[in-house]
Amino acid sequence: MVEWTAAERRHVEAVWSKIDIDVCGPLALQRCLIVYPWTQRYFGEFGDLSTDAAIVGNPKVAAHGVVALTGLRTALDHMDEIKSTYAALSVLHSEKLHVDPDNFRLLCECLTIVVAGKMGKKLSPEMQAAWQKYLCAVVSALGRQYH
């Protein structure tokens, strides 16, 4: 279980309050697929991902970005039980979808870049530290089935 200070909880909540899932989700997944092209192998049914423009204009990529961020947002309401909250998703991604668990980390890195771009100087080092701790807890929970 991850231990959270009151300040860390406030910082994570503050970051989430600045995130528009419908905007940041697609941007984060698009960035992930472009910067780390090997992650595209899990999205063959999404159609054309052959160019940056194709990825950015792909409605299935955008929709899945929203799904991914909506799922990530779930942890905010379950910060004291993140591992159990993501147990079923961990099983799905490992046993059925066979997703490399490092891809969760890559997506979260891309999300942090998107969030930092949106928040600018309002994303203080303390806020970022709490945000990174939150993302690491979720990534660990999603990768739990692989251990």
From Swiss-Prot:
It comes from the Eukaryota. InterPro entries: Globin, Globin-like_sf, Globin/Proto, Hemoglobin_b, Hemoglobin_oxygen_transport. GO terms for cellular component: blood microparticle; haptoglobin-hemoglobin complex; hemoglobin complex. Keywords: Heme, Iron, Metal-binding, Oxygen transport, Transport. Red blood cells. Heme b binds at residues 64, 93. GO terms for molecular function: haptoglobin binding; heme binding; metal ion binding; organic acid binding; oxygen binding; oxygen carrier activity; peroxidase activity. PROSITE patterns: GLOBIN. It holds the Pfam family Globin. Involved in oxygen transport from gills to the various peripheral tissues. Belongs to the globin family. This is Hemoglobin subunit beta-1. It comes from Gadus morhua. The gene is hbb1.
